[in-house]
Regions:
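Active-site core of metal-dependent hydrolases
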Residues: 174-276, 281-296
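Divalent metal-coordination and catalytic microenvironments
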Residues: 20, 35, 40, 62, ...
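Hydrophobic faces of well-ordered beta-strands that scaffold small-molecule active sites
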Residues: 68-74, 99-101, 125-129, 167-171, ...
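Histidine-rich, glycine-flanked metal-binding segment
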Residues: 3-66
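Metal-cofactor-binding active-site regions of metalloenzymes
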Residues: 94-100, 104-105, 120-147, 170-173, ...
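His/Asp/Glu-enriched, well-ordered alpha-helical/loop segment
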Residues: 271-353
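Metal-associated gating/positioning segment near the N- to mid-region
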Residues: 59-120
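C-terminal cap of metal-dependent C-N hydrolases
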Residues: 20, 345-391
């Protein structure tokens, strides 16, 4: 239920969310607490806050209140990248208030991405810059049809011009469709060179690369680098020939490489994730890899991916930490996003945990039957309601 008051009244809060259970992993909070917003930020969190001082009140009784979600792998450059989707209706409206575009734009296209997408969207958009200068423009020509497309100097120049938005360097390594045989593993090493020169990490899409195994990729990865699509079921995966997690995976995790889900249309396999988790391997971050080829399934949105990890046995706190506090640290915005601490930017989501049977399908057409589903019913961006299914 939502109540609004005369906008002319002098109120302490622009918005008050009351009676919900706050889950804020950054502060180890899982408790019934009210959250108040003013001037685009969180201003107070307490057991009870005065309803009379709020211009708008949302009653979240029986629901969970979380920081706005952070999705570290999406593709939101519509009209230029063949993967691109509109960020606001597909990400923000479904609870991902901050997203990281994972290489849709390269050095040649990033200025347009910034001007025509990032700066006009309500979704907060950051980026991994593709080492391929043209980015992910077409399905017909791979990013590395020629090795020259991996341009270190152009990548570094663009990073210097847009350091406020660019978090790292993205490289996709799938042979034939993305990387020609003549390019081989050159794009990986050029991405490493550019990232090192810029002092930033790399994000790697590893599947079916021009190498013997994932070992060859992981050996060039350092602390803070991101291996996305970590539970894919293709060649260059985390499972060895004996059906166990590769030793190189354990070693990489030990030295601080970030293993990210990046579900996508072809990069999440139930048998792989189940095998990995049975050996204690968990993703550091949960992301959707949401794009035009999976927004209508099997991904749908980030909340659906979270539901899959609830089915796998993670707790609500474990699931939400991987889309709030942990990615906030990786993008160096831990005091602004990924938390509802007073002073943080006013992004929040109200979730219902619906007890219902649901079919959860991976990227290979295999399904599991879940018994509960996370549904975002209200999204708050910059302290104001963006979407609200709880309106009176």
């Amino acid at each position: 239920m939502t109540f609004k008051k005369d906008v002319g009244l002098d109120m302490k809060y622009d918005l008050l969310i009351r009676n919900g259970t706050l889950i804020d992993p950054a502060r180890s909070i899982h408790a019934p607490l009210d959250v108040a917003f003013a001037d685009g930020k969180v201003v107070e969190v307490a057991e009870t806050l005065p309803v009379a001082q709020a211009r708008e009140v949302i009653d979240a009784d029986g629901r969970y209140v979380t920081p706005g979600l952070i999705d570290v792998h999406v593709h939101v450059f519509p009209g230029v990248s063949h993967f691109g989707i509109e960020p606001d209706p597909t990400c923000l409206a479904r609870g991902a208030t901050t997203v990281v575009d994972a290489g849709s734009a390269g050095a040649d296209t990033f200025p347009g991405f910034r001007k025509y997408v990032i700066e006009v969207s309500q979704t907060r958009i950051l980026a991994q810059l593709n080492i391929a200068s043209q980015g992910m423009v077409t399905r017909d020509i791979g990013e590395f049809a020629l090795p020259e497309y991996a341009d270190v100097d152009a990548c570094c120049r663009m990073i210097e011009q847009h350091r406020d938005l660019i978090l790292g360097v993205k490289v996709r390594l799938t042979k034939d469709s993305i990387v020609s045989e003549s390019s081989g593993m050159i794009p990986l090493h050029r991405a490493r060179e550019a990232a090192d020169a810029a002092g930033l990490p790399i994000m790697i899409h590893p599947q079916a690369a021009w190498c013997e195994s994932l070992d060859d990729i992981l050996k060039v990865m350092k602390q803070g680098d991101i291996l996305t699509h970590c539970f894919h079921g293709m060649a260059c995966g985390i499972i060895d020939e004996g059906g166990k997690v590769r030793q190189s995976v354990h070693d990489a995790i030990e030295r601080g490489v970030i293993f990210d889900v990046g579900h996508g249309a072809g990069s999440f396999a139930w048998d792989v994730v189940e095998t990995a988790m049975a050996e204690g391997i968990l993703p550091k971050t949960i992301s959707s890899d949401l794009h035009i080829y999976n927004v209508d399934g099997p991904v749908f949105d980030l909340a659906n991916v979270l539901t899959k990890f609830l089915h796998l046995g993670l707790s609500l706190d474990e699931v939400f930490s991987r889309v709030t506090s942990i990615p906030a640290e990786s993008v160096l915005l831990q005091d602004q996003i990924g938390t509802l601490a007073p002073g943080a930017w006013g992004d929040a989501v109200i979730f219902e945990l619906r007890e219902e049977t649901c079919t959860l399908t991976d990227s290979q057409g295999q399904s599991r039957t879940g018994t509960q589903r996370l549904e975002p019913v209200t999204v708050v961006k910059a302290g104001r309601t963006y979407r609200n299914e709880l309106a009176a």
